[in-house]
Amino acid sequence: MGVQKRQWIRRSFKWLAFVLLLVAAMGFTFEEIGRWQDRQHRFRIGRAVDVGGRSLNIDCSGEGSPTVVLESGGGGYGGYQWRVVQEGIAKFTRVCWYDRAGEGWSDPAPSARTSSSVVDDLHELLKRAPLEGPLVLVGHSNGGEYVRIFTARFPDEVAGAVLVDSTHPEQQEPPFMLSPVNRLPKLAREFLCSAMPLAQRLGTIRLLMRNAPVDVPPQFQSERDGVTLALRNQRVKGVETEMTQGCAATEGGAEKPDRGSGNPEVDQAAQISGRLGDRPLIVLTAGQYWKPDDPVAAREIANFHETWIHQLQPELSRLSTRGQQIIVDTSDHSIPEHAPEAIVTAVSQVVLAVRGLQNEVTPTAGTVTAGGNDLD
């Protein structure tokens, strides 16, 4: 190799190193500015409750017993998705939503979250808020698994439950329905998990999430600007928290989760949590589902949805001797946003049963139609 070629290679490596350092410095600066802006943004829905050196956010409204606690699904958005549901439930009893550690307006967890840390956080939050039982727990998606785990841990405090298109620990979705990370080869997953702390520091996740949509219900337009800015920034924190939890639960990406919620630790804890006894229970199941253009994918998803409606969700309803499944015909998985009235109706039935005003949850024809119901 000639002298000139070696010099050219050395210069190229120097320039490459310079460019990489420049990009890293820009990313680090971008992330630090973002974190500073997060700290300066004071807008909040709810209130901070100290749970031992850190705070969790909770928002409550309404009066009466039992207290309804709303447990969110995944995605890093936190509890704000429950605003419309909360408004309806508050007309007949006390109702609260909260942000899990590392999501929404809550402080991060001291280490990677686990199923135990999530339910222990909620228990401590309710104690310090303070909010007295009995409780009716409402869980959407993988939040339904936390409802089951909490009930097993603190059975004397839970009087009833509503599972909203809840994750089943044994569900096995078609590969293309798995999260993008779980579709990757093992080496790629391990690389992502090992590189994630650096990606966080260099602002990569913040950059990818900068235009994430935030849905503010029409009746809450007065808070649109504050909520949009707050939750868009906070979802960065939420996604990072969920990724950290997922990597810890899969041995740094070595294990490929193809069942349940995609988090083996949470799924296993829900699986062994046991039954719900004779507590009033309603299982709401989405009647609609994603229909891709690819005919093979569409057929596999349709087959999975049939299993979902007729096997997996009925199994959840049989967790209680007083369980009932209701199919929400006009909604997909996002029932809190697309059919909040179905949740409010289900919660009202469970609340009445807990109060002893009816022995069983009210029988229905098996379906609830979303949209058009008056919650007044």
Protein language model features and the residues they cover:
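Hydrophobic membrane-insertion alpha-helices, especially the h-region
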Residues: K14-T29
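N-terminal cap/lid segment of alpha/beta-hydrolase-fold proteins
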Residues: W36-S55
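Conserved HGGG/HGGXW glycine-rich cap/lid loop of the alpha/beta-hydrolase fold
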Residues: D50, R54-W105, R153
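Active-site loop/oxyanion-hole signature of alpha/beta-hydrolase fold enzymes
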Residues: S61, W97-V138
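Alpha/beta-hydrolase
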Residues: L70-S72, Y98-R100, V164, T285, ...
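Flexible "cap/lid" subdomain of the alpha/beta-hydrolase fold that forms the substrate-access gate
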Residues: S115, V162-P314, R318, G323
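Catalytic active-site module of serine/aspartate enzymes centered on a nucleophile-bearing elbow/loop
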Residues: L319-D376
